[in-house]
UniProtKB/Swiss-Prot annotation:
This protein's name: Probable Xaa-Pro aminopeptidase SS1G_06948
Family: Belongs to the peptidase M24B family.
Catalyzed reactions per annotation: Release of any N-terminal amino acid, including proline, that is linked to proline, even from a dipeptide or tripeptide
Source organism: Sclerotinia sclerotiorum (strain ATCC 18683 / 1980 / Ss-1)
Textual note on the cofactor: Binds 2 manganese ions per subunit.
Binding residues annotated for Mn(2+) 2, in chain numbering: D305, D316, E501
Length: 556
């Protein structure tokens, strides 16, 4: 195959496409002016499909790579079956691949020529026979070109020869995310002439640069990506609202999960960004509780952490509410404290802010509140703060990036506070490791905690009463036990835990809250309106049943 001619042809087609579409600003199609007697010759131009901005994303990656030549090589997820089965799991595309294509079907590979600015998708050959009968036809190259922001679509059988050709004739390395994603069937070594001698050079593949460049690019959301996150957030909000409406007459955590997921599926959001967390009572103290199978009766609070995906983009929302529609004194105190933590931290968000500082402010607010409630005591605020006592009640990071992953990537990987957690550490070391953040100036290398315009992050403070954490770790440690009011804890264990979480877009001079799910008084109002409606429904049913009995008696 003549790849140079193919490249030249795709470049020409790319230039032609720039002038194909002229969308109207006043509707879904635009009309050319015609004489009223010439109506049969009316021409119109359909509104163009809004394509996923794959080329924009590829150019962003090029920018952060800092290279003017080379090739990016990214395989999508291959299709596969469960072990010892002929059934396939639900498909979930590799997110780095999706970021450069918007393509959400298996067995494809994308390449991007940095110096030619050419984005090519490599697809399996057309399927036929029983495969079509069972699974339908694969999209054709023509269909893909019409739908996606690509320069060319080619079939996979030509890929190996293309990569070999590229390695021998084009400048720069072939960049892969991971060594294991390097293609196996390519002539990896390049033979070059040095005078009369043939010298074998190094492999043309490089796995040291691409991941960090893509992480940095993915942290800054394009307008299209923000639109997807807003859509996911809107559907998620409706799921939370429907749970609130029915909460008073639900009996099990499983019903909460069912209502939320059904709401999302009915709105075409068929995938959850993560497993639904519907923890009631003390289950709310388990951060990633997902059993969702226990009764609600007799329990104070529900912590519902749930968010759907829309076209692979996540939302992440947590609401904590009283199951009865009314807070106990202890639950109200903890909810108010967490709400204060969140409100103050959100107000700190803006470009240039260090998320580490926001995170530590949450601990300061938490500690003051816990001291006022008498849950921690026996020292000054500064003494208790430097000891890290608040971590016993607030043991996780304040937030994370949101995007193609619910815990999305950014400069340096994930957001800075997540780097502190090593599940291999001994429990007694957790707090010491956590508070290294106060003194380790090097932990912010790579700028992962510095907020920038168009980042999306969560702010999700929480206060928890985990029996295991408190009784097996902190109360057994002389360093922390002296500060914790063990007797008062007994009153707060039934609260379980409170977490409140919103998704925030960093704007030019501050933030925008993308989360519209009700919280606080607005959530309570929905719960209690649901209770009133249920009570009216029961009264109506009883009245109808009474009338039926009266008619039956009269008839006989």
């Amino acid at each position: 195959m003549d790849f140079r001619s193919l490249i030249a042809s795709s470049v020409a087609q790319d230039k032609d496409r720039e002038f194909e579409v002229r969308p109207s600003s006043r509707g879904s199609w635009s009309c050319k002016e015609v004489d009223e007697f010439d109506a049969l010759s009316i021409e119109y131009e359909p509104k163009p499909i809004e394509k996923y901005p794959a080329k924009l994303h590829a150019r962003q990656v090029k920018k952060y790579l800092g290279l003017q030549e080379g090739l990016i090589y990214l395989p999508g997820l291959p299709s596969f079956n469960y072990e010892d089965s002929d059934m396939q799991p639900a498909f979930r595309q590799r997110r780095y691949f999706y970021y450069l294509t918007g393509v959400n079907f298996p067995d494809c590979i994308v390449t991007y020529s940095i110096h030619r600015d050419q984005l090519w998708l490599w697809i399996p050959p057309p399927n036929s026979g029983r495969s079509v009968i069972y699974n339908g036809s694969r999209p054709t190259a023509k269909e893909i070109m019409a739908k996606y922001d690509l320069d060319h679509v080619e079939t996979l059988p030509h890929l190996d020869s293309y990569l070999t050709w590229y390695a021998h004739t084009e400048p720069g390395k072939i960049h892969v995310l991971h060594d294991y994603q390097t293609p196996n069937n390519v002539e990896l070594q390049i033979t070059r002439k040095n005078g009369s001698q043939s010298i074998m050079s190094e492999s043309p593949f490089d796995s040291t640069k691409l991941e960090e460049a893509m992480n940095t690019a993915r942290a800054i959301k394009s307008p299209y990506e923000l639109k997807m996150i807003r859509k996911a957030s809107a559907i998620t909000a409706q799921g939370h609202i429907n749970v609130l409406r029915g909460l008073r007459y639900l009996s099990n955590e499983a019903e909460i999960e069912a209502i939320f997921t059904a709401t999302c599926i009915a709105r075409q959001a068929k995938t959850q960004a993560y497993g639904v967390i519907a923890g009631s009572g003390e289950n709310a103290s388990t951060l990633h509780y997902m059993a969702n199978n226990e009764p609600l009766k007799g329990r104070q609070l529900l912590c519902l952490d749930a968010g759907c995906e829309w076209d692979c983009y996540a939302s992440d929302v947590t609401r904590t509410v009283p199951i009865s529609g009314e807070y106990t004194e202890e639950a109200q105190a903890i909810y108010d404290l967490v709400a204060k933590m969140q409100d103050e931290c959100i107000e700190m968000l803006k470009p240039g802010a260090n998320y580490r500082d926001v995170h530590m402010h949450a601990h300061k607010v938490a500690l003051r509140g816990l001291m006022e409630l008498g849950l921690v005591e026996g020292g000054t605020f500064n003494e208790l703060y430097m000891a890290g006592v608040s971590v016993a009640f607030f043991p996780h990071g304040l937030g994370h990036y949101v995007g193609l992953e619910v815990h999305d990537v950014g400069p340096g990987g994930m957001i800075i506070t997540n780097r502190l957690f090593d599940f291999n550490r001994k429990p007694a070391d957790w707090t010491d490791a956590y508070f290294q953040i106060l003194s380790d100036s090097g932990i912010n290398s790579g700028g992962g905690a510095i907020l920038s315009k168009d980042m999306v992050v969560t702010v999700e403070p929480g206060i928890y009463f985990s029996r295991y954490a408190l009784e097996e770790v902190y109360l057994k440690s002389p360093k922390y036990a002296k500060y914790i009011n063990k007797e008062l804890l007994q009153k707060y264990y039934p609260v379980g835990g409170v977490r409140i979480e919103d998704d925030l877009l960093i704007t030019e001079d501050g933030y925008e809250n993308l989360t519209t799910a009700p919280k606080g008084e607005a959530a309570l109002k929905i719960i209690n309106e649901g209770r009133e409606q249920e009570e009216k429904r029961v009264v109506c049913e009883k009245a109808a049943e009474s009338k039926r009995k009266q008619k039956k008696t009269w008839f006989w």
